[in-house]
Amino acid sequence: MNLIPTVIEQTNRGERAYDIYSRLLKDRIIMLGSAIDDNVANSIVSQLLFLESQDPEKDIHIYINSPGGSITAGMAIYDTMQFIKPQVSTICIGMAASMGAFLLAAGEKGKRYALPNSEAMIHQPLGGAQGQATEIEIAAKRILFLREKLNQILADRTGQPLEVLQRDTDRDNFMTAEKALEYGLIDKIFTNR
């Protein structure tokens, strides 16, 4: 069951009901709380573009609790975060895994955070192929290319040498908030506002 809370606000014109995500958007907060697919990416990208149009100078905050998902969908979010004028802060709540961790690291340097009991997980891209040998070869080359591209971006975002990223993403690599801070995925652990 997908229950979305409603928030009632009092205004000088009476009461106004919002779903919680719309109300958070008014405060420039975007929630990424699911696996990342094309629909989720389109929603996040649309919200980023909308908030930029509202005020290109004011920060946007993305709260992340995601197991990851599609690389291409995640890259659409990443590219938009880099493209828009407002700085984007990222906050890990719960778990930022795979593409979720990649997007956590993609926040504005100095504005990437985690709550104390949250976790991050990085690994190499997952994929599979079937069909003729040529099709499998094409898919294998593509996933190797994506692995190198993602590792290079993560190396740039974390300050880790590329060789370290290649080693550390070879298998699932879980990190506490403290380890994510030490690694360079985040810049600070939030304990309160």
Swiss-Prot record:
GO CC list: cytoplasm; endopeptidase Clp complex
Annotated compartments: Cytoplasm
Keywords: Cytoplasm, Hydrolase, Protease, Serine protease
GO molecular function, one term: serine-type endopeptidase activity
Active site: S98, H123
Coiled-coil residue spans: none
Enzyme class label: hydrolase
Gene3D superfamilies named in the record: 2-enoyl-CoA Hydratase, Chain A, domain 1
GO biological process, one term: protein quality control for misfolded or incompletely synthesized proteins
Catalytic activity: Hydrolysis of proteins to small peptides in the presence of ATP and magnesium. alpha-casein is the usual test substrate. In the absence of ATP, only oligopeptides shorter than five residues are hydrolyzed (such as succinyl-Leu-Tyr-|-NHMec, and Leu-Tyr-Leu-|-Tyr-Trp, in which cleavage of the -Tyr-|-Leu- and -Tyr-|-Trp bonds also occurs)
Superkingdom of this protein's organism: Bacteria
Record EC number: 3.4.21.92
Quaternary structure note: Fourteen ClpP subunits assemble into 2 heptameric rings which stack back to back to give a disk-like structure with a central cavity, resembling the structure of eukaryotic proteasomes.
Known role: Cleaves peptides in various proteins in a process that requires ATP hydrolysis. Has a chymotrypsin-like activity. Plays a major role in the degradation of misfolded proteins.
Cited PANTHER family: ATP-DEPENDENT CLP PROTEASE PROTEOLYTIC SUBUNIT
Entry similarity comment: Belongs to the peptidase S14 family.
Protein name (database record): ATP-dependent Clp protease proteolytic subunit 2
Organism of provenance: Bacillus anthracis
